[in-house]
C-alpha cells in the first residue's frame, strides 16, 4: 500500500483503496456496504399482484417517499421461545406443585472463554444473589457511608466485600442499621487465602484520632448494638490490643447503654493482650476459627492455628467469667470440610464454653483466592443450625449469606445481654435488701 493511502476493510466484504478520506465519509461507505448485505429477521410480506390506487398514483408515491425514514429500522431478533402464554400461566398458577429441593437447588453451569479454550463454570446459585446497594434508593445507606468517609473510618463490610452491606447499612431505621467498623486501618499483616482485605508487612501507622472518631460516629448514628473488628497488626508490639481497648472505652463513655461486640484477631497467642481487650468493657467477645481444624493451614495464614483460636476464646471466659460475657465464633462452609470434621469443631468450641456460633457460605472474592468446593443449600444450613442448638450453643445464625457480624443474630444477643443485666440488678438489689434486713435484726437483738 502506498504511503498516505487508506484501505477500508469490513466484515461485510467491502474492500478498496481510498485516498485520504475523512472519518465521516469512511463511516458512510461502511454503512452503505452493511445495508446492502445485511439480513433481517423480519421477512416483508410478498407484494400484491393487484396494485392499489395509492400505488398507481404518482402523487401518493411522491408523498410516501418523502415521509419514509432515511434509514431502515433496526431489526429485532427473537431467539427464545415462549413455553406458555400468560393465560396458561394464570390458569395453572394455583395448581402448580412447588419445586422439590433437588429442583430448586439445582446449580447451573455455563461455558466461558474464547473459542477453542472454553471452560465450564458453575453459576452463582439463586439463593446467594443479592440486590446491589444504592445510596440514592436508601438514605440511611448514604448517611452511614458519608459519615465513614468524613471521619476517615473503614468497615469490614466494604473491605471484605460483604454481600449483606445493603441490608445492614440500609436498615429501615437507625436501630436496625448496622456497620462493622474496622479499626487500625485497611491493611492487614496476614494473608489468609479467603480474605480480600489488603495485606502488607509494614502497614501505615495507627491513627491516634481513630478511637475518638469511631465513638463520635457511633454516637451520631444512634445505634443500640455495634460490632468492632480490626485487621491483624503483627507489626505492633501489642498487636493493637491497647488501641482496640481505648476505642471501646471511648464508646462506652459517650454512650454507656450501647452494646459493643469486638471481633479480634488472636494477637499471636499472647493471652495478656486478649485480657486487655476483654477487660475494656465490651459485651460480646468474638474471635473466628473460620474453618475446621484440618483445613486451617490451607485456609488461614500460617501464623493462625485452630488450637490458638480456642485458647483465645477460653481465656476470655477465664477473665470475665462464664456469665460475665458472651463469646462468639464463625465457621465458613463450602471449603471442602467433611461432616465429621464439622462435628469435631463444634465439640471443641463447646469445651471452651463458646456461646454463639454462625455458619455462612464461603464466597470466592477474586480468582486469586481459594475456589469454592461446594455451595451449601439452605436446607443444609438449617440442619447445622439445629445441630448446634442441640449441642448447647446459646444461639446459632446459619444461612448462605450469614457472616460473623450479621445483624440477624444481634437482636437475640442484645436481648440476652439486657436480660442478664436486669438479672444482675435484681440480684444486687435483693442482696442489699437482705443485708439491710440482717443489719436491722442485729441492732434489734
UniProtKB/Swiss-Prot annotation:
The keyword Isomerase does not apply. GO terms for cellular component: mitochondrion. PROSITE patterns: RADICAL_SAM. Its main location: mitochondrion. Pathway: Protein modification; protein lipoylation via endogenous pathway; protein N(6)-(lipoyl)lysine from octanoyl-[acyl-carrier-protein]: step 2/2. Residues 42-77 are annotated as: Disordered. Keywords: 4Fe-4S, Iron, Iron-sulfur, Metal-binding, Mitochondrion, S-adenosyl-L-methionine, Transferase, Transit peptide. This is Lipoyl synthase, mitochondrial. [4Fe-4S] cluster 2 binds at residues 188, 192, 195. InterPro entries: Aldolase_TIM, Elp3/MiaA/NifB-like_rSAM, LIAS_N, Lipoyl_synth, rSAM. It is found in: Mitochondrion. It catalyses: [[Fe-S] cluster scaffold protein carrying a second [4Fe-4S](2+) cluster] + N(6)-octanoyl-L-lysyl-[protein] + 2 oxidized [2Fe-2S]-[ferredoxin] + 2 S-adenosyl-L-methionine + 4 H(+) = [[Fe-S] cluster scaffold protein] + N(6)-[(R)-dihydrolipoyl]-L-lysyl-[protein] + 4 Fe(3+) + 2 hydrogen sulfide + 2 5'-deoxyadenosine + 2 L-methionine + 2 reduced [2Fe-2S]-[ferredoxin].
